[in-house]
Amino acid sequence: DKEMNGGKGDRVFLERIFHKLLLNFTWWVNLKDEGGNNIFGGGFLGMDNIGVFDRSAALPTGGHLEQADGTGWMAMYSLNMLRIACEIAIENPVYQDMASKFFEHFLHIAGAMQAIGGDKLNLWDEDDQFYYDMLHKENGEAELLKVRSMVGLIPLFAVEVLTPELL
């Protein structure tokens, strides 16, 4: 928007959309992080055809699924919100705290993908060099669903470049 308007972006729009996105982000954090460990599952991303089964439905065997793509998407969402908050904070420093909040969310999510809970389970498989969904069975066992699909690539989308003028 800035490039098309002589270096001046639509901050009013950016603030409005930030608050709507904040509501959606909060919904994901509160309702789709089943274990409270910054690993997400059970949400419809509009990409549910990339898994090997319907991940919006309950598992027929019980247990639950922790989704590499849903978690990676939330990491990316955190970085997108960080970027928007930094942009708004240029003129309204109140948003600096929000930028910090989303940076912390990103760090927690990225860390959780490498060490889930006290068992230190990973969505990343070091041998395969790939992310996988993790199936948590009702008996407490957990295993990676080693299917190479888009599921394992989505976490790689969580990248952001912050320029010095935004910091």
Where on the chain are the PLM-derived regions?
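Well-ordered alpha-helical segments within folded domains of soluble proteins
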Residues: 1, 71-83, 148-159
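Juxtamembrane interface elements at the cytosolic ends of transmembrane helices
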Residues: 81-88, 165-167
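Active-site acid/base region of carbohydrate-active enzymes
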Residues: 3-76, 89-140
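Carbohydrate-active enzyme catalytic cores, enriched for enzymes
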Residues: 63, 129-167
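Short, solvent-exposed secondary-structure capping/transition elements
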Residues: 2-6, 164-167
